[in-house]
Amino acid sequence: MLTPSAFGSPHVSVIRGQPAYEDEALLRGQIEAAIAAIDLPADFIQPGEHVVIKPNWVKEHDTRTPHDEASWLAIITHPAFVREVARWAARQLRGTGRVTLCDAPQSDSSFDAIRRLHRLDDLIEECRRDFPGVTFTLFDMRCEEWKVVDGVTVSKRELPSDPAGAVDVHLDEKSEFFGFPGLGK
């Protein structure tokens, strides 16, 4: 059962829209309609605050078709959607604050490939240009990236991770998975 947190009760909004990734105005309108349906308080985002946006950047390609660079469409948040949500957040900050785009993809994913395929550096630069008083940051939250060949991890590369630091949490017997067989023991 979900209970209210320090951030309030959970809210979800679903709208039926047109698949409009190429039409920025239509996509922006659909995103704004979905956000409006949540009925956030007017002061939900204040100038000077830090907004964190966590898209789903699971993997740079569908593992069933690794050589098809378009296979990412079904497994990540579309970059046009990420761009419009980041721009919405920047507008709420009214010229001052921070927007961070970050995720922790699968350990065997290449964040460099995700950045390249989705032109995330261009997205960040565009936002910096259009919202000069807002700081935009992009980073991979993982501590390491694995190289996997034929299902076998052959190397691991340490990553800088979250510049604000990391905390290890050990739930042990408090975990919902405690007592079940598998890697979560």
PLM region spans:
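N-terminal and secondary-structure boundary signal
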Residues: 1-185
